[in-house]
From Swiss-Prot:
Pfam families in the cross-refs: MUM1-like_PWWP, PWP3A-B_C, PWP3A-B_N
Family, as annotated: Belongs to the PWWP3A family.
Disulfide linkage: none
Composition bias type Polar residues, residue spans: 102-121, 285-302
Domain PWWP: 377-438
Organism: Mus musculus
Residues modified as Phosphoserine: S128
Annotated stretches, region: Disordered: 102-144, 166-200, 285-304
Family matches, as CDD domains: PWWP_MUM1-like
Record-given protein name: PWWP domain-containing DNA repair factor 3B
Amino acid sequence: MDGKYVLCNWKDQLWPAKVLDRSESPSESKRKNTSSLEVEILSLDEKITVESTDTKVLSKSAVEAIMSSLAVQSEVIIAPREETAYERSLKMALEMVKEGTNLSQESMSEEQPTATASENVPEQPPDSPPHKKFRKLESNTQEDSASILLCSESDDSMTDDKLQVHTTGESMPSEMDTKATENLGCCQTDPSLADEDDKKEEKKKIDISAIMSVNLSLKEESEYIKEEKFVPSSEDLTVPKEESQDILPEAPLAVSSECSIVSENNMEDPGEGPSNQNLVSYANQNQSSVESDVGAETSTAGCSGDFQVSLPTRDTVSSDLLLQRLDLEDLEEEARASGKLLSLNPASAAALENDNEDDDEDLPRFILHYETRAFETGMIVWFKYQKYPFWPAVIKSIRRKERKASVLLVEADMSPQKKGVRVSLRRLKKYDCKEKQALVEKAREEYRESIDWCVSLICDYRVRLGCGSFTGSFFEYYAADISYPVRKIIKQDTFRNIFPKLYNENVGEQLPMASQAKRVSFQKILPDRMKPARDRANKNLVDFIVNAKGTEDHLLGILKGTKKSKWLKSFLNAKSFTPCIETYFEDEDQLDEVVKYLQEIYKQIDQKMLTLIKDDKIKFVLEVLLPEAIICSISAVDGLDYEAAEAKYLKGPSLGCRERELYDSKILFEKRRRSLPNEGH
């Protein structure tokens, strides 16, 4: 549309207005000429005067941007409202802009000479001052749009297109910067100069929007490539036919698809295809052949997968570097994986070093790996017996249903006729387990020479078995002459008692005791409720004696001699030593509480009684006061007479059958345990 309509700043908003009059005003600065405009606000018919610096050219993009911001604000307001004057003014301006756009599209054919004439703008000299930073974005946009427009307008021949594209690509930055500064100055200072530019604006915006959308999609693809480390295929970078015809000719598109297919084929898995070095060389050869057939400029623009016309050749170099970097990373990962395998298996790592040092020594392969098979008869395992450390043993037999095995320890006088030990399979460890070295070091603390001899014997057996010089079980190997060079190292007199022993001379006496103790210990015994019941009954007696002080009068009468006591008479006539004292209370806390109370009662004793007992406080409290207090409390709590209460006290706590059996078995076990060392001597 013509330049008589502008966007002016009024009431802190940009209002569309019609220019009525323009007047220039002199300024103090010689370089700047300010002008004031008399405008009329659309849909309001209100005339105002504004400065030219506060106005902008009325364009479709500016109006749509303002309306979109108002739409966002209206979404926040939930309540319905009427259309404001500002919104009506913007809608009117948008309709006027659209009508002007239709007119400009009809006159595009007449504007083509004007667009092509922009090529002849002279280049900016190299010593020209740099542009401002805020102008860089517009200059880049204008540069891309102008280059694509030049390419789309010249449809006569393929050769002319290529030459025109690259000449404009080389001289475009300086020309577009100059044009951008001129256009920017015109838009900000003088709206009247926008009459001619408005007609070109819609055409440029269409092309710029298409270019920007393609550029944004390609930038996202390039970032995705860097993150995922692969070259995208041609299908990922295709554009619809309508846009591709307006942007680039058909020949470069074909070349780009071919080059992208080549790069995609080169990015196959290195494990399935050729080696990494061949992969890179194969990619370079394919790329060079494409460049020789089509041309350096076209192949560069096509293989990069980008739809910009003037693209630097360093993009192809970066793709080659990306391939080489991926190959190096794959090699490093394979090296790390092999290093981890060697670190997890130290035996295999040591074997590989030995193979490199001495090629003549060829050990069997199966001794370098951990055993993964199940337990079998004749297998060598680790077994811990009683107080001894883990020791190499041989499985004599296995009971699969019970999951138990009979094992025999490896020792100097080993014989298959000896009786083994039956143990659970869970207590056994494979000989080549991961803890093998730790088990050997633990056994060396007390049996250094013996465990070294066992390890050498087992190693010799497995080497001969792997080389084929011997076939048979470990027991057969130990009894054969082939094992004599290893067996002769051990002298029976020297190593008689430094091997773990499964049995000794008292094996016949130990087995019945062990079985009986196991039978008693593994019985499922329910908790005994008789003792807690007795403790609760005794708690009532303690409360009666200590808290209620129900026996205090009876005890004070005995201390002062007013009451006769059978226990006092026996105390005075007794000998100096008393073998046993019946306490009746089984809980020590209850007994301590009663004794402390009786000691307080003892302080009230008279001098005559103190002389009779010879001032023996502890013995008098335990043998006289304690029985009298318990009997008196039983009589009062249970409702018995003194004789019946005394008989219950003398009988003691009533033990159950289970308590008696446990007590008797404990006494017998302690007695037999003490008798065994005496028989050994």
